[in-house]
């Protein structure tokens, strides 16, 4: 079963998938093993991820491992219709199209759950949220889940703290081979890529304000600086603010940054990072972009209330005319890298989705002894993925000698 925009788009989607596959060597190795061992035979996996080419490679990997796949998007604007069609053509149950309404978005999540999955793979926790609220009749069938992103992990840990979480979830986001690369290098490149594609403007010479200095914010600030921008960071955490300053960036409150910024990029995972009092202080022509999971980091309601007129001036660019100035919002305030571009680079998602595939296998093999809480990815898995990635890149590294290992384990040898 499938509900996509146009199944006839599948050939173009397949071309994108094949291109991504060529640049995802770690996941390819896992797929070959899954194809032979069929660990997911008889298992249904429900997925809510950004439905584009790299995600399709992950879904295909799980399918090769014997799984029945039911998949939808995790954001109304991130699905690529040709890729969704290609996934449907492969025999997956696909319910997704770009430009879904909020109602359609949740209907599609529910359609995935109608397949009664044994394992869920989520990005943002909306699928898991539904299971714990409106689809509780399915909980007994769930072995466990995997969560991809920072925003979802924040929600899951809040659920765990309240005792509301009913099954184990693997924290893929905090794997070293995920957040150190996906969040930093992936978001850093793809967020700027989305802004450049949407606006066709020069970054050099502009003041770019980055809200949040977690791994995503670090990456965005680094890439904006590399393109010639003056970068300002806003933070609520004094340690991260200090780190940003030591990294060479100006640090100030958003109310001050609002007065000098040309481009604003939110990377916090929190709501109302840019709101009315900030918008009122912004320059004419200020550009707002969000690189966080949900579309509430920039308060769109405040923009709408302040605007005398609203119109789309370019694909992915909405102009809010406040009378005395114009403010531009990219991608409707949703993930700029996916709403306005193709998301993270293939090589980065290779590691992230290798973690997802192996985390799903870990759930399958260990669910009976796992408690209903959030679990970290095993460190051995991180090391294996990093080693495979280095090998694919043609890089060799040193190994400790026996004497070095002994030295590191012996407390007696000192000065």
Curated annotation (Swiss-Prot):
Q: Name one Pfam family in it.
A: AdoHcyase_NAD
Provide one Gene Ontology biological process annotation: S-adenosylmethionine biosynthetic process
Q: Which domain of life is it from?
A: Archaea
- Please name the SUPFAM superfamilies in this protein's record: Formate/glycerate dehydrogenase catalytic domain-like, NAD(P)-binding Rossmann-fold domains
Per UniProt, where does substrate bind? 123, 148, 178, 182
- What pathway is this protein said to act in by its record? Amino-acid biosynthesis; S-adenosyl-L-methionine biosynthesis
Q: Which reaction does it catalyse?
A: S-inosyl-L-homocysteine + H2O = L-homocysteine + inosine
* UniProt entry tagged with the keyword NAD: yes
Q: What else is known?
A: SAH is a product of SAM methyltransferases and is known to be a feedback inhibitor of these enzymes. As a result of this inhibition, organisms have evolved efficient enzymes to metabolize SAH via different pathways. The pathway found in methanogens differs from the canonical pathway, it uses the deamination of S-adenosyl-L-homocysteine to form S-inosyl-L-homocysteine for the regeneration of SAM from S-adenosyl-L-homocysteine.
**Name listed for the protein in its UniProt record:** S-inosyl-L-homocysteine hydrolase
UniProt source species: Methanocaldococcus jannaschii (strain ATCC 43067 / DSM 2661 / JAL-1 / JCM 10045 / NBRC 100440)
Tell me the classification of the organism that encodes this protein. Answer: Archaea, Methanobacteriati, Methanobacteriota, Methanomada group, Methanococci
């Amino acid at each position: 079963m499938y509900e996509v925009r146009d199944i006839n788009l599948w050939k173009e989607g397949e071309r994108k998938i094949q291109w991504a596959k060529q640049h995802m060597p770690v996941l390819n190795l896992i797929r070959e093993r899954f194809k032979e061992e069929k660990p997911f035979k008889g298992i249904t996996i429900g997925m809510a991820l950004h439905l584009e080419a790299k995600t399709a490679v992950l879904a295909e990997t799980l399918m090769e491992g014997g799984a029945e796949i039911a998949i939808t998007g995790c954001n109304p604007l991130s699905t690529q219709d040709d890729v969704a069609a290609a996934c449907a053509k492969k025999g997956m149950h696909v319910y997704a199209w770009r430009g879904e309404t909020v109602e359609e978005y949740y209907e599609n999540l529910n359609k995935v759950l109608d397949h009664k999955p044994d394992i869920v793979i989520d990005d943002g926790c909306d699928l898991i949220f539904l299971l714990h609220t409106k689809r509780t009749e399915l909980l007994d069938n769930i072995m466990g889940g995997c969560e991809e992103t920072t925003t979802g992990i924040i929600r899951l840990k809040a659920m765990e703290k309240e005792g509301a979480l009913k099954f184990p979830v693997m924290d893929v986001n905090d794997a070293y081979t995920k957040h150190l690369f996906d969040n930093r290098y992936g978001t850093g490149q793809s967020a700027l890529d989305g802004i450049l594609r949407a606006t066709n403007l020069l970054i050099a010479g502009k003041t770019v304000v980055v809200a949040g200095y977690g791994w995503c914010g670090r990456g965005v600030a680094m890439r904006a600086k590399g393109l010639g921008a003056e970068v300002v960071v806003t933070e609520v955490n004094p340690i991260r603010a200090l780190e940003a300053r030591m990294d060479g960036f100006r640090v100030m409150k958003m109310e001050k940054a609002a007065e000098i910024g040309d481009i604003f990029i939110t990377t916090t995972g929190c709501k109302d990072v840019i709101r009315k009092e900030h918008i009122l202080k912004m320059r004419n022509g200020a550009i707002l972009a969000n690189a966080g999971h949900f579309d509430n980091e920039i308060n769109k309601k405040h923009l709408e209330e302040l605007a005398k007129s609203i119109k789309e001036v370019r694909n992915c660019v909405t102009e809010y005319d406040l009378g005395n100035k114009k403010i531009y919002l990219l991608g409707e305030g949703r993930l700029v890298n996916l709403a306005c571009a193709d998301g993270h680079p293939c090589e980065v998602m290779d590691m992230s989705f290798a973690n997802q595939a192996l985390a799903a296998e870990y759930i399958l093999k260990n669910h009976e002894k796992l408690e209903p809480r959030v679990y970290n990815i095993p460190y051995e898995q991180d090391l294996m993925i990093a080693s495979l990635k280095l090998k694919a890149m043609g890089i060799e590294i040193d190994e400790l000698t026996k004497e070095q290992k002994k030295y590191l384990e012996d407390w007696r040898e000192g000065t």
